[in-house]
Structure formats: C-alpha cells, structure tokens
Amino acid sequence: MLLKLLQRQTYTCLSHRYGLYVCFVGVVVTIVSAFQFGEVVLEWSRDQYHVLFDSYRDNIAGKSFQNRLCLPMPIDVVYTWVNGTDLELLKELQQVREHMEEEQRAMRETLGKNTTEPTKKSEKQLECLLTHCIKVPMLVLDPPLPANCTLKDLPTLYPSFHAASDMFNVAKPKNPSTNVSVVVFDTTKDVEDAHAGPFKGGSKQMVWRAYLTTDKEAPGLVLMQGLAFLSGFPPTFKETSQLKTKLPEKLSSKIKLLRLYSEASVALLKLNNPKGFQELNKQTKKNMTIDGKELTISPAYLLWDLSAISQSKQDEDVSASRFEDNEELRYSLRSIERHAPWVRNIFIVTNGQIPSWLNLDNPRVTIVTHQDIFQNLSHLPTFSSPAIESHIHRIEGLSQKFIYLNDDVMFGKDVWPDDFYSHSKGQKVYLTWPVPNCAEGCPGSWIKDGYCDKACNNSACDWDGGDCSGNTAGNRFVAGGGGTGNIGAGQHWQFGGGINTISYCNQGCANSWLADKFCDQACNVLSCGFDAGDCGQDHFHELYKVTLLPNQTHYVVPKGEYLSYFSFANIARRGVEGTYSDNPIIRHASIANKWKTIHLIMHSGMNATTIYFNLTLQNANDEEFKIQIAVEVDTREAPKLNSTTQKAYESLVSPVTPLPQADVPFEDVPKEKRFPKIRRHDVNATGRFQEEVKIPRVNISLLPKEAQVRLSNLDLQLERGDITLKGYNLSKSALLRSFLGNSLDTKIKPQARTDETKGNLEVPQENPSHRRPHGFAGEHRSERWTAPAETVTVKGRDHALNPPPVLETNARLAQPTLGVTVSKENLSPLIVPPESHLPKEEESDRAEGNAVPVKELVPGRRLQQNYPGFLPWEKKKYFQDLLDEEESLKTQLAYFTDSKHTGRQLKDTFADSLRYVNKILNSKFGFTSRKVPAHMPHMIDRIVMQELQDMFPEEFDKTSFHKVRHSEDMQFAFSYFYYLMSAVQPLNISQVFHEVDTDQSGVLSDREIRTLATRIHDLPLSLQDLTGLEHMLINCSKMLPANITQLNNIPPTQEAYYDPNLPPVTKSLVTNCKPVTDKIHKAYKDKNKYRFEIMGEEEIAFKMIRTNVSHVVGQLDDIRKNPRKFVCLNDNIDHNHKDARTVKAVLRDFYESMFPIPSQFELPREYRNRFLHMHELQEWRAYRDKLKFWTHCVLATLIIFTIFSFFAEQIIALKRKIFPRRRIHKEASPDRIRV
C-alpha cells in the first residue's frame, strides 16, 4: 500500500510541468549534503573530538604526544612577570620607599639619633648635581641654636660637636624671617662624627650636611660673603700646598685660607674681607693665570636641603629604563611552543599588568592578578617575589603538577615531563651551590658532627646543633698547634685562614662535594685531587701514587706531598667498606671503585703523623677480606736556610717565610672594573705564584722597649682573634723593618750561622725538597722505610670512607706498623698553568676562630649566582639600603646602643633568607648540609606545596606580609624541594601485613609467617627466631581482648599451623601485638614520603648579563654552541652605562636568532593591546556587558512595538481565538409569568 502511494506521488511529481527540474535539484542537494556531512564527521573525529576528549591532545599544540608521554597527566605553566616601565608601578615603588624611610626616621628619633641621617644608598642618591658643588665640613641646624649659645656652650648641647671651630646664623632663602645655624669644623672626619653622633635629650632638631656651589640659579641658596671659589687652574694640582705656592701675589694677599678640592677641580677661598670679592673678580678679568691657565673667581652659595635639586636624581633612581625588560617573556613563550608543546595551559601572574603584545583571545593563556591568589588581601600591594611565589599554587584551574618559570628562563632544547618527574624515581631535583654558612667560618658540615666548634657556638647555628651543650663534646683539633709559637725556637706552624682552607679545597668547591658522583668543575683542580675521581683519571698522573701490594701494611708518603691516591688494583676487585682514624690532617678520603683507587687529600703544612685505615675489599672471586694499613704523612715543606751578616740586627734575621695568595677569578666582571689590581709575581719551582713576605726571626730581648711592647700587643691581638695570621705576619714584618732598617733587603746566603745570643751552635737546615723535581719526571724507583714494630691504638673516632655502598663501623683501630717496601711513582713534574694556579694551603685551627669572612669569599659551584628574585627592583637592589638600615636600627633598638660603636654591616637579603629557611629545616628535619636549587624551571606539586605551608603556617604568613624581599622570607624553591626530600612517611603496620599476606586472605599462613620472620630478623634465620615470633603472637592472643584480635570472626579451619596453639594470625592481632610491632619498627626504617633523584648541572646554563659587550657576546655564543635544556639570562645591565643599548641590542638579536617564529600567544607586530592593566580591561568589559544588555533590551522593545503596530488586528483576532470571551446569559425574572 505504502509502495503504491510512493509510486503514485512520484509519477505525479514527474508529470508536473517543473517536476523533472525539482527532482534533479533534489538529487544534487542530496549528494552535496552527503559529502558535506561526511567531511564534518571526519574533521570532528580527528581534531575537535580529540581536543575535547582526548587528554593526549589537550595541549597548546593541539597534537597527540602519546608516543612520547608516559601518562596523559595535564601539566600547566605558571609565569611571574612584571612590567618595570609602568609609571603607576614606579609611583607605588616610590611610595613604599618613602614609607620605609618614614618608619626608619621614627626609629632614629626613638634612638635619639639624627632623623635626617641618610642611609648609605640614600646619601648617594641625594647627590648634588649643581656646578662645582662640593660637600664642606659644615652642619646646618634647623631650628637654629639659642641666641645666647656660644661656641663654648655648644658641646653641652651637642657633645659630638666638641670639635667645632666656628658657628654663625644665616637666613632661610624661602623664609628670610627665620634663621638656621651653621656650625663649621676643621676636618671632614670631625663633621662626619658630629653628624652621626646622638643628640642630648632626644632633640628633634634637624641637622643637615652643608654644600657649597657656584650655581646661583638653583633654588634654596644662600650667598656666603666671605667665601669664594677659584677655578681654571691646571688639573695637575692634587695638594693644597702645590696650588698655594703657585698663586699670584695679588690673590694670595687677600685670602686667609685655601682648600683644594681636586675631584671638583676647584679651590675654596676664605677672604680677609667680605668685600674683597669684587676686587678679586676685577683682577682675574685682567688675565690672572697659573701655568698659562686663566683663573676664574666665582661667588660661593650655601645649600643644605638637596631634595629639590636632587629630584632628577631620585627620578632616575626609579626611572623606567632602570627596570626595563627585554621582552624575555615573549621569547620564553616561543621556547615553550617550540620545545615543550605538551603543556596544557599557561598562567601569567602579574600585579594587574598586561603585556602589550599578548593575545588575550587565546584560550590557552590566562592573566592572573595578585588579588586572585592572595588569601589575605591586606598584604597587597606587594613587591616581594617570595610573597608572590608562596601563593601561585592557589591559581584556580591549575593542574596538580605545574611548571613554574620566571620570565628570564626559557628552554634551549626539547623538554619532556620526565625531565622534571618520573613515576619510577620521582621528582628530579637540580642542586647547585651550598647554603651560605650560618656564621662566619662555620660550614654546614661542622654542625652537629660531635665536635664543639667555636665558630658555630652561637644562636645563629643553634649552638653547633647541640654539640656545644654540656661538657661531653670534644674539640675538633688536638693540642699542639698554635698561631704564635716560640719565635726564637725555630720555624713554627703557620695556619691559613679558616673557611677557605678547611671547608673548601678550592674557590667554590666544598670538601663535601668531593666524591659525590658528580663532576664539579670547581673541584676538577689539583688542590681538590680532581674531584677525587669524579671527573675521570686523565689527571691522576699529577697526584702522588702509591700502589697497595699484598702483605704490606705500612706505607710512607714523602714529606710535602698532600695529594695522593692508593691503587688497590693488584690486590682487590672493589672496595666494600672503609674507615680511617680521626686526624685533623685529613681533608677527604674516599674509595673510587670505578678506578680501583683510594683517594687521600690532606691539608698542607701539617706535622708528621700516621693515618690508620681499616678496609674491607673484594677479590676477583667476590670473597671479602679485610686489611689494616698505616700511612705516614708529613705535609710540611722543608724550612729554608738561615744566614748571617756582620751587623748587629742582621745577625738576628732568619729565612723568609712565603705566604701564598691566590687570585680569585671573577669571570662575569669586566676587566676594567676589577679592583684592586693584582700585581703578578714570579713563578716558583712548583709553578705557583707566591708573595714573599719577610718575617725576621729576632731575639726579642735585644729590641728596644717600644718594639717589644708593640710585638706583645700583636701577639695578644692574634691570640684573641682580633687579627688573622696573615695580618699578624704583615704587621710584624713592617714593625721589625722599621727597627732593623734596610738590612733585611740584603741578599741572604744559605749557610750555617752561630747564634751568639744563646751560645749554641745550630745545625744547618736541609735544603727544601721540591715536589716532583724535573729530574725525576717519568722515573720509577723504590725506596725502603723501616720502623720498629709497635702497637698503636687510635683513640679518635673512625670516619667512614664512602664507596657505594657505605657501611659504617665504630671499631677502633689497633695495628702494628711493620717495615715494608713501598713503591713510589713520580710520573711528571707539576707545572700548573697561570690560568689555574692554586695557593699552597695551610692548616688553620678553627678553635682560634681565624676564618675568612663569608662576605668576602662566598664558595660556590660553576653555576653559583646570587639570584635575588624575578622582580626588576630586586635585581637592582632598590630597597637593599633601607633593609640594611632597618636591620641595623632594629638591632640598636633591641640593645639600645650607640650605632657609632655597633656599626652597620651590609646584608645580603637573599643569603640571609636562605640561612633563615635552613635553620627552620634544621629544627624540623635535623641538621644536614644543603644546597640551593638551580635557577631554572621547577615542577611543583600543589598538594606538596600545601602540605609545606600547613607545616609552617606562621612563616609563610610572615613571608606574604612582607612588602619587599626580607631576610626572613621562606624561599620558594629551596623550602619546597627540601621539604619534598626530607618529609618522612611513618611506617604503617597494616601495610607491612598486606605485603606479607600474599594470598590476601586476611590471615597469615605458616609460609607467610616465615616471610615476616625474615623481614624482622637477620639472616640466616634460626629456629629460635621463628618460634620466638610464634610465641609472641600466642601470648598476645591470650592477653588481648577478643574484640581487638577479632579471632572469633575467623573460621577455625581457614589456616592450619604446625603449632596447634598458634591462633589465626589476623591483621588486628599483628597490629596490636606490641612485641611484634616493636620488631617491625626496628627492622623497617621510615621511608621518604616522596621519591626524588638528585641531578647534575649539565643541562643548565645560567648567565649573568652585565654591561661588557664582548663578555656578553661570549656568553651568548657559548649557549649557541652548547645548547642546554634550561637557559637563564639574568639581566644585570647597568642601564645608565654607555654600552647598555648595545648590550640590549645584542641580547635581542640572540633571542631572535634562537626563536624567530612568533608564537600563538602573540599579537601581530602591527597590533597591541588597548589596555595594559587588568582593572582597565575589567572596567571596559563591565561597561561592554552593560551596554550590550541595554542594547538588547531596546532592540527587543522596538521589535515588540513594531509587531504590535503592523499586526494589531491579527494579534487581537488570535487572542480572541485562543482566549474566547464567555457570554453572560441573564436569567429570566421569576416574577414574569408565562402566558
């Protein structure tokens, strides 16, 4: 029926006049629609579908990386960025600085100090920029001194003004009815002391430094009638006396005093008569000259308030160019699109700023303001990078694991998630240089090591981690070495400076870095034994080699050798365990199984001693055997010859003592800016540079009384630690030279001498033996040392050598020394090239506190850089002077002392914050040596970061509160990674039970009980161990109540045991049986909560970009030649330098050469964003939405009105049809009668 109907309709359509055309068009439309539908389906399934539902394609590239990514784990990128050229930002910075200055002014007022005293940077900032403007020894007081106050009364009001030579009043230039007092001093030192001194009774009087200038156009000047400036004379005059002798007679007769200011090329004249200026001015116009140069006399104007004339300098201090960036964020985004296209979204955290080139329409990029992430909005605005970083994990919609970058960090090669994290090994942590010491001369490895170290015995180091509490702690070094010694009794021990020679074998290489399985470039030098084998064996020929032979236990290292290694290739295949006796001569000892060597690196300049080793080795058959060896060492150099002369004092002279001094390389500092200039000296026989400081040995009793007193004072200062040994030697040498005259300069011949003062004939000293003389290059020889057989017991603690694995032992060593033959190999003479020469290091006694200050030598690796933060004002240290001043004032408030005596010590806020966090971590996780994470992209887990902040809520809240970077900030990467590496997962007994319960039955069988016994007992397992465990379980089942053990719920036939008394071993029974849980806790150690892996520095390139063009070009070319995965170009350009523009052009050219293709996140070059602040954009969007809403309302009203106007009748008819009216029928009246 249906088919006939369809056939009839078809015939009807075809029989129609246009039926054929309609059918043709219908067929074409059907075919085209089919193709269109198929294309849409295909396109949807390939791209749109996968982008929306396929997690492998949910990234900025929109492509699948399934063949490279292990898991479809979404990873976002978070940037922190700021536009340093924003005028609103610069105003806010200036306001914060002024607020800090106000607070410090109030603190000075509390301390009774001068409220106008500038900080170190402020004084430089308020620079007088007028013509011939000089700072003179005068102070200006406002309000003025009392009218009856005389010069004699002045010290009673201001004790620090006792050196004043004159005083007078002058009228204020802007208010002539009021005066200010001017106090004159003779010298600059007197005026500085008076300006820095406290005021009696907390006076609020303003005290200013006075300036004189010839620029009469500046505001706030007062003409000085009796003073004048002389200029135009040759600049060769550097002393006042030189200029005074050259003055013409007409000029010199009219002046009282003359003071030359050579730095300004002017001289200040004090005239005899205030009216004499007009006469001098006329005379100078009549061609008054000095050496052909025409002189000029100018009036002198007094000023004191520099705020008006120095406004331009202040504006320059916070100018846009100072904080200008190089569009690093643009190129960093390009690097992500090129080398890390697998990231999902990009979040840019700003203070509300928007990059002018950023494409805000891209759905993959989002601007996040500080208001969106800060929990406490009262902490805003903030200008502290740690405060901002502590909140970035709170970004809404952020992935659990995200990568955090600064805008100056980019990728140089393809990067994948497993460069940051792998599921098998966990988080990859990239560490660089060690945390700065908690105190000067106290490395982190000394804290809580069982020895009380004087340098660490302070609150900053937690009293050496507890080593100095009580009387049980031992001192690190044995007695017998002193810094002074008996001068007349022969050559004494000389100690070097503390941290550089004890804790660091080379500049930037800590002893703890040796043999750590990473080749550290700073350690790959001779003085560090070439990183104890970590950097290969190419330079082993420069070390002293000793071959260990079977049946030999006594070895001797020649005198003066302190870099040696022992080869055990002839007696063993690998080292298993090793300990050595406690001896201060040892700097480092370790086993390198890869090279079959034992490395022994010692301190130079130490007395002869014997080191005992207890080694456990493996032979070729994997059989372990133990050997005990004794090594005699003496790292002192042989003393030089004495000599005699005929003069009285010359007979007291002894050989000179060389004091080496190393050149510290500053690779990133231009040569023209390196100061002081180091003078090169001759190279000695060992190829090292050394400076000859002659220290005469004299009989003290023959010197004058004055010399004896001064020498005793020097000895006392050295004993108290006021001066270092180097300073002691230099001072003593200079002192003796002043009494001995030039006799020390005569050439001293090596020969025997007779000490007539003592009447004893001294034996001539041997010539010092040079290390590896040229005559023995490549030569092999054998020598025999014989010692009497004796037993020596070492009472010091044993140190574990560190072959992998390291097994600790506390056994004491007792080994007889036997006479044996030692094979000595001298392979090549040591010739150190000048580029890598090293000092001869000498041992120092830390108990005396002779340490090199950390501020002078900050040890670090090749990548060590003091990275102050990502914000430009942190890089330029804009607030550093105020932070230093605040720290000083807080210290003075705490003790209420005079700052003149306490002084100010400039701080490094970044280093102080590292010490602060390190101290917190020590208190929570124990004392250990820590290193600073590299400045590179970091993968952060939001959950881990939240756990860290939950553990230290007050510390992070304090960090968030700080407006600028503070010394008590929680450093973001440092605190995060060391929490991740230090957090411990408590042992879960239930988890141990499930591991042993392999059949998952909930009850342990006999086999599973044996497995548990092997886990908690040492192997081989004895019958007593197994039965003891069973008895523990039986006893617990009898003592514990049934509701805890839940034995009644177990079917009796589920498990059958050999011991019929053993109940079903359920999880409840095991977890509640204390003897068993104690055994498990003893056998199972707490594991790290998070897995991690320490990585090297091979893929990190950190470059500090400064203003030296050639140096910058070399740095960038190094990146071009050796591309790394993680590249950081830290901008430290001096934008006021003449080469700053060139450096920025070179940097921009480098960026364009590396990443020339614009990314999807950029607008075309001819476009820029209309709004550069989020609040402007949000206001515009709110206005747009409101306008759109009202526009739609008006349009809807118009449409409705139009419809009603044209279709009114139809609408009414439709209404009547849909809603018909009901007709009302009137009822008939009941009174009406129907007829």
Swiss-Prot record:
<feature type="region of interest" description="Disordered">
    <location>
        <begin position="751"/>
        <end position="783"/>
    </location>
</feature>
<feature type="binding site">
    <location>
        <position position="999"/>
    </location>
    <ligand>
        <name>Ca(2+)</name>
    </ligand>
</feature>
<keyword id="KW-0479">Metal-binding</keyword>
<dbReference type="Pfam" id="PF11380">
    <property type="entry name" value="Stealth_CR2"/>
</dbReference>
<dbReference type="GO" id="GO:0051649">
    <property type="term" value="P:establishment of localization in cell"/>
</dbReference>
<comment type="function">
    <text>Catalyzes the formation of mannose 6-phosphate (M6P) markers on high mannose type oligosaccharides in the Golgi apparatus. M6P residues are required to bind to the M6P receptors (MPR), which mediate the vesicular transport of lysosomal enzymes to the endosomal/prelysosomal compartment.</text>
</comment>
<feature type="binding site">
    <location>
        <position position="997"/>
    </location>
    <ligand>
        <name>Ca(2+)</name>
    </ligand>
</feature>
<keyword id="KW-0472">Membrane</keyword>
<dbReference type="InterPro" id="IPR035993">
    <property type="entry name" value="Notch-like_dom_sf"/>
</dbReference>
<dbReference type="Pfam" id="PF18440">
    <property type="entry name" value="GlcNAc-1_reg"/>
</dbReference>
<feature type="binding site">
    <location>
        <position position="531"/>
    </location>
    <ligand>
        <name>Ca(2+)</name>
    </ligand>
</feature>
<feature type="disulfide bond">
    <location>
        <begin position="438"/>
        <end position="461"/>
    </location>
</feature>
<feature type="glycosylation site" description="N-linked (GlcNAc...) asparagine">
    <location>
        <position position="114"/>
    </location>
</feature>
<feature type="glycosylation site" description="N-linked (GlcNAc...) asparagine">
    <location>
        <position position="179"/>
    </location>
</feature>
<keyword id="KW-0812">Transmembrane</keyword>
<feature type="domain" description="EF-hand">
    <location>
        <begin position="984"/>
        <end position="1019"/>
    </location>
</feature>
<dbReference type="GO" id="GO:0005794">
    <property type="term" value="C:Golgi apparatus"/>
</dbReference>
<keyword id="KW-0333">Golgi apparatus</keyword>
<feature type="repeat" description="LNR 1">
    <location>
        <begin position="438"/>
        <end position="473"/>
    </location>
</feature>
<dbReference type="InterPro" id="IPR002048">
    <property type="entry name" value="EF_hand_dom"/>
</dbReference>
<dbReference type="InterPro" id="IPR047141">
    <property type="entry name" value="Stealth"/>
</dbReference>
<feature type="region of interest" description="Disordered">
    <location>
        <begin position="830"/>
        <end position="850"/>
    </location>
</feature>
<dbReference type="InterPro" id="IPR041536">
    <property type="entry name" value="GNPTAB_reg"/>
</dbReference>
<dbReference type="GO" id="GO:0009306">
    <property type="term" value="P:protein secretion"/>
</dbReference>
<keyword id="KW-1015">Disulfide bond</keyword>
<dbReference type="Pfam" id="PF00066">
    <property type="entry name" value="Notch"/>
</dbReference>
<dbReference type="Pfam" id="PF17103">
    <property type="entry name" value="Stealth_CR4"/>
</dbReference>
<feature type="compositionally biased region" description="Basic and acidic residues">
    <location>
        <begin position="837"/>
        <end position="848"/>
    </location>
</feature>
<dbReference type="Pfam" id="PF06464">
    <property type="entry name" value="DMAP_binding"/>
</dbReference>
<feature type="domain" description="DMAP1-binding">
    <location>
        <begin position="699"/>
        <end position="823"/>
    </location>
</feature>
<feature type="glycosylation site" description="N-linked (GlcNAc...) asparagine">
    <location>
        <position position="988"/>
    </location>
</feature>
<dbReference type="GO" id="GO:0005509">
    <property type="term" value="F:calcium ion binding"/>
</dbReference>
<dbReference type="InterPro" id="IPR021520">
    <property type="entry name" value="Stealth_CR2"/>
</dbReference>
<feature type="binding site">
    <location>
        <position position="516"/>
    </location>
    <ligand>
        <name>Ca(2+)</name>
    </ligand>
</feature>
<dbReference type="InterPro" id="IPR031357">
    <property type="entry name" value="Stealth_CR3"/>
</dbReference>
<feature type="disulfide bond">
    <location>
        <begin position="452"/>
        <end position="468"/>
    </location>
</feature>
<feature type="glycosylation site" description="N-linked (GlcNAc...) asparagine">
    <location>
        <position position="148"/>
    </location>
</feature>
<keyword id="KW-0325">Glycoprotein</keyword>
<feature type="glycosylation site" description="N-linked (GlcNAc...) asparagine">
    <location>
        <position position="614"/>
    </location>
</feature>
<keyword id="KW-1133">Transmembrane helix</keyword>
<feature type="disulfide bond">
    <location>
        <begin position="505"/>
        <end position="528"/>
    </location>
</feature>
<comment type="subunit">
    <text>Hexamer of two alpha, two beta and two gamma (GNPTG) subunits; disulfide-linked. The alpha and/or the beta subunits of the enzyme constitute the catalytic subunits. Interacts with LYSET; facilitates proper localization of GNPTAB.</text>
</comment>
